């Protein structure tokens, strides 16, 4: 088919996931999983790893190792992280799908479907997660020393990167470096003077010239991350890019404003991000005991482990994210519809972009620790 047309911001959140959960769906997933070439290295692995795939028109393609940690907001991705079990040789798997701000509903659906397919390939041993740009879970961010979020560079969202573009044809961009916990974010921000402030480090990339601006209140980690990026930029452009550093603290204001870092940026308004809305912790039950699948509220304001029964699926809404508990004795219908119902549930919530984590009874002990109100 022709290149996908990008939807407006986060239109994918209204997408339909009705295919999930049917008996045909499970059969198709299993058959597809056994023939998906992307899963072959996962099946062969005997030691911990981090693998990433990008959705390209309903299929996946591996992200090269030197690009892992770079995410384009016009795309969706599948991420598999394997760690060694404590005191054992068994591998533990976390499978995430990440949705860029400008990803289409088709790309989102493919990423979600492939995440469940990979879990099927691993005999349901993985913990499944949904991640949305700008709302990533702490677990997801912990995988990367540097997490890079870039805007779409070429029409259609399947970004090319600078190495395929002449320096003078490259679209100017403004990059922000910000440390959150142990991870340094590099995020492409609005191309405006009003995006720049003293608390972080910024790089103005003009193609043949690039400038690092160190805010007077930035951290040493942000400085070093930006410097490393700038050095890598020079290397990748084979000396075709001149770089320099502008320190706000050491530069007189009347001199600084004449620097190209400032003169090249337009002074246009920047849309402020809406602060997250208040989330009331709540517990819901997904059950087919009545003959049809129904989601009902169990409690609001708290979530007690004592309300959990092994023969149903439960959804726990918290400010950190949405957790889905798969009871060990739940029905096949309840289990297969857990992720799709979590997605539908969040569509009605004030914060529809919260991370989603789906855990089995066996996985719940570690992932739901600290969630319960006893």
Curated annotation (Swiss-Prot):
One of its GO terms (cellular component) is actin cytoskeleton. GO terms for molecular function: actin filament binding. GO terms for biological process: actin filament capping; actin polymerization or depolymerization. It comes from the Eukaryota. InterPro entries: ADF-H/Gelsolin-like_dom_sf, Gelsolin-like_dom, Villin/Gelsolin. Gene3D superfamilies: Severin. Keywords: Actin capping, Actin-binding, Calcium, Repeat. Gelsolin-like repeats lie at residues 58-109, 180-220, 278-369. Severin blocks the ends of F-actin and causes the fragmentation and depolymerization of actin filaments. This severin binds stably with actin both in a Ca(2+) dependent and a Ca(2+) independent manner. Belongs to the villin/gelsolin family. Severin changes its conformation upon binding of Ca(2+) and then interacts with F-actin. This is Severin. It comes from Echinococcus granulosus (Hydatid tapeworm).
């Amino acid at each position: 088919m022709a290149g996908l047309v990008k939807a407006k911001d986060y239109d994918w959140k209204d997408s339909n996931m009705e295919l999930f959960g049917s008996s045909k769906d499970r059969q198709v997933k299993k058959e597809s999983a056994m023939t998906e070439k992307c899963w072959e290295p996962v099946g062969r692995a005997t030691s911990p790893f981090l693998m990433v795939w990008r959705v390209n028109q309903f299929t996946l393609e591996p992200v090269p190792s030197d690009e892992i940690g770079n995410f384009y907001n016009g795309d969706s991705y599948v991420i598999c992280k394997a760690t060694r079990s404590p005191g054992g040789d068994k591998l533990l798997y976390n499978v995430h799908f990440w949705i860029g701000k400008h990803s289409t509903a088709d790309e989102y659906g493919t990423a979600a479907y492939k995440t469940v397919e990979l879990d099927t390939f691993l005999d349901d041993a993985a913990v499944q997660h949904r991640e949305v740009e700008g709302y990533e879970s702490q677990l997801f961010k912990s995988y990367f020393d540097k997490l890079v979020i870039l805007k779409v560079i070429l029409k259609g969202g399947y970004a090319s990167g600078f190495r395929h573009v002449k320096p003078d044809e490259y679209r100017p961009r403004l990059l922000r470096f910000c440390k959150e916990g142990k991870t340094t974010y590099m995020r492409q921000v609005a191309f405006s003077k009003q995006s720049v402030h003293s608390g972080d480090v910024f790089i103005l990339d003009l193609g043949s010239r690039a400038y690092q601006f160190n805010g007077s209140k930035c951290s040493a980690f942000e400085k070093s991350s930006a410097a490393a990026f700038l050095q890598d930029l020079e290397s990748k452009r084979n000396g075709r890019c001149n770089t320099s550093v502008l320190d706000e603290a050491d530069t007189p204001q009347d001199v600084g404003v004449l620097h190209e870092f400032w003169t090249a940026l337009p002074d246009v308004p920047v849309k402020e991000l809406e602060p997250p809305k208040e989330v009331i912790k709540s517990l819901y039950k997904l059950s087919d005991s009545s003959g049809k699948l129904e989601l009902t509220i169990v409690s609001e304001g708290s979530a007690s482990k004592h309300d959990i029964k092994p023969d149903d699926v439960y959804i726990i809404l918290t400010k950190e994210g949405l957790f889905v508990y798969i009871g060990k004795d739940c029905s096949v219908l309840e289990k297969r519809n857990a992720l799709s119902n979590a997605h539908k549930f969040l569509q009605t919530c004030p914060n529809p972009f919260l991370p989603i984590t789906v855990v089995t009874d066996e996985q719940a002990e570690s992932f739901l620790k600290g969630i319960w109100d006893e």
